[in-house]
Amino acid sequence: MNKNAIQKFAIWARNELIAQVSQRAYQYGIDESGFGDASADTLNGRLLTAEEKSQRQELIKQIKEKGYQQVMEEVAYTWFNRFIALRFMEVNNYLPSHIRVFSDASGAFKPEILNDVLHLDLPGLDSGKVAEYIESNDTEALYRYLLLTQCNALNSALPVMFERMGGYTEMLLPNNILRQDSVLGHMVSDIPEENWQDAVQIIGWLYQYYNTELKDDTFAQLKKNVKITKERIPAATQLFTPDWIVRYMVENSLGRLWLEGHPNAELHDGWKYYLDEAEQEPEVETQLAKLREEYKTIKPEEIKVIDPCMGSGHILVYAFDVLMQIYTSAGWDQREAAQSILKNNLYGLDIDDRAAQLAYFAVMMKARQYDRRLLTRGIQPHIHSIIESNSLGGAYKLAMGDFLLSKEHQETLNYLLDAFIDAKEYGSILCLEKRDYVGLLRAWNLTASQTTESLNLTLWFAAVEHEIPKLIEQAIILTQGYDVVVTNPPYMAVSNAGGKVNDYVKKNFPDSKADLFAVFIERCGQMAKKNGYQAMITQHAWMFLSSFEKLRTKLLAVDIVNMAHLGARAFEEIGGEVVQTTSFVIRKSHIADYKGEYCRLIEPTSQQGKEDMFLAGENRYAADQSNFSKIPGSPVAYWVSDKVFSIFSENNELRSICAVKVGLQSGDNNRFYKFWPEVCFSAINRGERNALRNPKWFPCIRGGVFKKWYGNQDSIINWENDGAQIKTCKSAVIRNTQFYFYENISWSEISSGGISFRYNYEGSIFDQKGPCCICKNHSDLIYLCGLLNSKPTQTILNILCPTLDYSVGPVSTLPIVMTQEFKVVELSQNNIELAKTDWDSYETSWDFKRHPLV
């Protein structure tokens, strides 16, 4: 697949479509500055048709509600989605007419539909209009008409992708679409046709690349402290999951669910990312055997699978393939299986309308691959964009009488109308009460229209008749249990979201409130049935950071079946070390002493390298997760040996031997910090606290580059009058002043490599980037400096701090073996002196005398 061509086209197409759609709006007197008379009958001397007038008024109404830019964006992506859907269908010969809309048989941008127009059998086609366009030689107008008619014709088969035309979206179809340099021309000529052939993944790549500039702009605004709105959350968080990781997640959750109860060597061998169970103790095997007996009773049509953050549907499409293999292994015909999968198995939700459209389309095209008549059967999948109830009003405001023939249904309806206000802010993390939503849907369809007793209720029903069933089905999807929950959730600090999301998460998910990916870990666990499976790819921070310790406690109460610990660069589109990920499969059960299978893939520096290591079976560990609690904070340290676990359980922590403290935050570094050569040297108090009368400048330990034993002493801080000026700074945080000016050991809180510990003489302050250990006994401090700089300590810190963050919390829990071995102190002291001599041999040291070679 030529991703460079796809990316280049998608980014260009978005800007071009927005410009072209805006130009069409301008032709109707509408631009960013205003829209004139909404009820105008003429524009620029031209009389508007009744249809144009209605479309224009509808457009103006939308602009009033959402804003001009948002509406132009929405119309642009609506046409983009339709164009790529039609292109996919024509290349794969899925169009009911079997006549190409954009190209000819050779693949050139010469629409076949124009050449065959006189023989075209297309529902809704007006042959009279066609004849008029041909007679007037208006090829552009003819093609616009044919394109709109084709979209309308697909409405009955694919109503979510091809909504019935006639609204302002039709009015804003760009001009000059037959030109070679149009969006259609570039789509046909720039993306190789083979990229569209039976490769529905192209839909996901187009969606991701289409959002590139919007995503960049969103993060640029975030740096200016502009929160991410619900309209921009999809662009900010959408990330196309690598195909092999999708296969790993689906095969080890959905595939495992089936194989555990229905062993099948052919299926097992065909799923190359499937991991066999780790070797278990006999007692564990007995418990697993009981689970397998339960799984034996499951039938293919009973399996429920959901992706609650489905994006463009990549995971659902592969789940469809695996379900098809399960069905056929159970004796089903492919055609009937495809229909059953749509009706019974697959569910998907997303807050982004355009992503939901594409996911819906991708799943339908996958079903069409197995059933040639699928598009004529009227079957629709359970794939939905979250909808809000804001514009639906509240039935409870009206006299309801015997509406729905049930007070319970009335109360449930009103509950949903309240619960789904601003639902796109929250998406699938919305937690609803368990109620009879299925009964409510049945009652709505059977009795609602006959039980509206008052005029107001009748008018309200007429306005919401078709929207309420969507709301109810949404509630059903959010509350029913699933055998398999599999997703790649959004990665976004909750603090970057709007206040509504922030407040909701703090109230409902206090143990995972730091990031949306963690919230979804917890939420997906709620959606899974007992003994069901949960498969995800998330940032790996939840495995180690103290802010997720309570979440880890919850996760360690269920069985981690296996994990592919990916680390950095698991996504080829993301470079650097910041985004580090892990993919894992959880079974919602708890078997004591169960061992999960863990694949440590953090060393390869490319997406392909990680996949190759996984398939090679390298770096595999079988770990009993109950051991994790032996380490402070219970990190998911699956690679740790029993010997190392015993080191933690048998020795004291660093914080029990010395004070381990974090320092101050000045609140304004440019104002309060300097490098020592920037001030008069004699004005720096480097010794006893009162060596100078009313001193202003003091040495300050601030972390720095990797340097063991001694060094990184080049910063000073304004601490005049005990930091009086700093204390007036609103954003300053003053901590642990009672430990200032003592000799200590410091390290850099953030490090891209290993950690290094340095000895500091008396007389320094320390800040948050240079935390310190302070001991009462000088010999103990020197001994600790040696121990902390040893290789065993680095090995243990790799367990406690596998991210870039060596904060005080995990470092203070280091297990420490104290001995009276004088040799350790002597060697450590020698190393400190050698390191100081080296540091002082450069002019950047305030103790520099002369270069050693002079």
Where in this protein do the model-derived segments appear?
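SAM-dependent methyltransferase catalytic region
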Residues: 224-563, 589-590, 602-603, 612-613, ...
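Flexible, glycine/threonine-enriched loop-and-boundary segments that flank and lead into catalytic domains
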Residues: 59-62, 276, 280-304, 453-486, ...
